[in-house]
């Protein structure tokens, strides 16, 4: 299964500048998913990260992997994005191996390692031109929107 940006927008609550998936190129429900993010110099963070040598922020690679895991969770067991939210609980064994720069096409992949009820654990990788840039283990949960803690 492949998802274009229109279908991604129906699943994820994220919008520009924090929607970090351009296309989901493969989904195997309950198993894995792959997506791409095309990095351009017009990204809003490049003027400050870093002006003389722009690099895609590593924390946004983790966010992109989290978004892809949310799409995989939806494809595995559809939920109503208006009433449910898929959110990140944590990351483990995170490694950043290569910088990502304007002009790169990030290839993202997530693979489910374990699922218990509403908790999902997955392995994620980000590569450019078949060179591994980063990898991490992701832990996330699906919950009712009204059960999320507020900032107060």
Name each region found by the language model.
Residues 16-56, 61:
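Catalytic strand-loop segment that frames the active site of acyl-thioester-processing enzymes
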Residues 3-15, 82-83:
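Short aromatic-glycine motifs in intrinsically disordered, low-complexity regions
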Residues 49-81:
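Helix-adjacent hinge/juxtasegments
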Residues 18-20, 106, 120:
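Hydrophobic core residues within well-ordered beta-strands of beta-rich domains
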Residues 9, 52, 95-98:
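Beta-strand-rich interaction surfaces with strong enrichment in secreted/lumenal proteins
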Residues 1-2, 69-107, 133-135, 140-141:
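Hydrophobic beta-strand-centered segment that forms part of the acyl-chain substrate-binding groove
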Residues 13, 30, 100-104, 111-152:
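HotDog/MaoC-like acyl-thioester-processing domains
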Residues 23-26, 93, 98, 112-114:
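A residue-level detector for short acidic-glycine micro-motifs
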């Amino acid at each position: 299964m492949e998802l274009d940006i229109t279908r991604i927008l129906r699943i994820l609550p994220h919008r520009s500048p924090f929607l970090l998936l351009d296309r989901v190129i493969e989904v195997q429900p309950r198993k894995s998913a792959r997506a791409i993010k095309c990095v351009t110099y017009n990204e809003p963070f490049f003027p400050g990260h870093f002006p003389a040598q722009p690099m895609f922020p590593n924390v946004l690679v983790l966010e992109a992997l989290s978004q892809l895991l949310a799409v995989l969770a939806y494809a595995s067991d559809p939920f109503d994005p208006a009433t449910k939210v898929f959110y990140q609980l944590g990351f483990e064994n995170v490694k950043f191996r290569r910088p990502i720069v304007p002009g790169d096409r990030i290839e993202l992949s997530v693979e489910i390692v374990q699922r218990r009820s509403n908790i999902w654990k997955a392995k994620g990788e980000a590569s450019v031109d078949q060179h591994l840039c980063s990898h991490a283990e992701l832990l996330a949960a699906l919950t009712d929107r009204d059960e999320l803690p507020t900032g107060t």
